[in-house]
C-alpha cells in the first residue's frame, strides 16, 4: 500500500516528457485507474490560504545597527523594545529566547530590535550602555525606560503593556 501511494505521487508529479525511467525488478506498477483519485485539476483549483492578515506585523527580532537605527527605532510609530547584547555574553544568551517570544506575542503592537554592542559601539555609547544585556523602550523616538540584566519575561511584559496601553 505504501509503495503504491509512493508511485501514485511519483506519477502525479513526474514531468510529462520525462525521460527518467524507474527500474524496479519484478514490481507491479499501479494501473491508470489507480491514479484516478489524484486528479491534477482538483489539486490545482485549491484556493490560497492566508496565514497572516497583517503584512506590516513583524513577529521576529530585527537586527538594528548604526546604519538602520534611525529608520527602525527613531522613526517607528509603535513602541520599540531594543535589546543591547554581545555574542560572548552569557546572560544575553539567556534573555534572547524571551525577546523572541515577546516579538511573537506582541507582533503588530511593538517592534523588537537587538543591537550587537561589538558591531555598533556608537549606538551603545549614545545611550550610555555600560552593562549587557540592557533593554530600552522607545516611544515616539524618545527613550522611555531601561532594564539592565537578564530579567524574567513577566518584567518585560509589564513594561511593554505600560507603553502599548498609552498609545
UniProtKB/Swiss-Prot annotation:
Keyword annotations from UniProtKB, A to Z: Chloroplast, Disulfide bond, Electron transport, Plastid, Redox-active center, Transit peptide, Transport
Transmembrane segments annotated in the record for this chain: none
Family indicated by similarity: Belongs to the thioredoxin family. Plant M-type subfamily.
Identification of the protein by name: Thioredoxin M-type, chloroplastic
Protein's UniProt keywords contain Ion transport: no
Pfam families: Thioredoxin
Cystine residue pairs: 89-92
Function: Participates in various redox reactions through the reversible oxidation of the active center dithiol to a disulfide. The M form is known to activate NADP-malate dehydrogenase.
Domain Thioredoxin intervals: 54-165
A GO cellular-component term linked to this record: chloroplast
Transit peptide location on this chain: 1-53
GO molecular function, one term: protein-disulfide reductase activity
Organism name: Zea mays
Localization (cell): Plastid, Chloroplast
Source organism, top-level taxon: Eukaryota
Subunit-structure text: Forms a complex with heterodimeric ferredoxin-thioredoxin reductase (FTR) and ferredoxin.
The keyword ATP-binding appears for this protein: no
